[in-house]
Amino acid sequence: MKIDEFMTTRIESIDADRSVYDAIEKMVDRRIRSLLVVFSGKDKDHGVITARDIVFKVLSKKSDPKSIKIASIASKPIVSIDRAKTIHDAAALMEEAVIARVFVCEEGKIVGVLSLLDVMAASLILRARGNYVP
């Protein structure tokens, strides 16, 4: 089963120079757990900030999220996988990198994101179709 059958194509992003507080607001407002972090200038790679990053790196340390820039806690570079790969390929990559989501790319451009929940949904569908391979 191909990744693009389960990936989310609406990717929410935020600038790296914004505050962690801004990320919290956006994530809570949109009911999402991660944001693609966009870096400007000479360092144009992407990063990711997750709810886990915010809780463990900022809130648990009683730091002020308004005074911390996203760039300082974002994970970088992102882990990505080609759109043509399978759900099993994505699951193996997530396990190897110990991450909960991978960004899906096509010809070097980010076209989606696939989460652990998406992988579990694919597993249920494969099992229901009788195509499940453990």
Question: Where does each model-flagged region fall?
Answer:
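Short glycine-rich, polar/acidic loop-and-turn segments at beta strand-coil junctions
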Residues: 39-41, 53
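The conserved cystathionine-beta-synthase
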Residues: 14-32, 38-39, 80-98, 104-105, ...
